[in-house]
Every structure is written in structure tokens, then in C-alpha cells.
Amino acid sequence: GFDVIDTIK
């Protein structure tokens, strides 16, 4: 998503 917030989830 934005940044690594939902990218790692």
C-alpha cells in the first residue's frame, strides 16, 4: 500500500 505498512502485512 503506502510505505511498508500494508506491504509486509
From Swiss-Prot:
EC number in record: 1.11.1.7
Gene Ontology BP terms: hydrogen peroxide catabolic process
Localization of this protein: Secreted
Similarity field: Belongs to the peroxidase family. Classical plant (class III) peroxidase subfamily.
Name listed for the protein in its UniProt record: Cationic peroxidase
Cofactor(s) needed for function: Ca(2+); heme b
Gene Ontology CC: extracellular region
Keywords (A to Z) from UniProt: Calcium, Heme, Hydrogen peroxide, Iron, Metal-binding, Oxidoreductase, Peroxidase, Secreted
Recorded GO MF terms: lactoperoxidase activity; metal ion binding
Biological role stated in the UniProt entry: Removal of H(2)O(2), oxidation of toxic reductants, biosynthesis and degradation of lignin, suberization, auxin catabolism, response to environmental stresses such as wounding, pathogen attack and oxidative stress. These functions might be dependent on each isozyme/isoform in each plant tissue.
Superkingdom of the organism of origin: Eukaryota
Cofactor binding comment, as recorded: Binds 2 calcium ions per subunit.
Disulfide bond found in the keyword field: no
Bilayer-crossing regions: none
Enzyme class, broadest EC rank: oxidoreductase
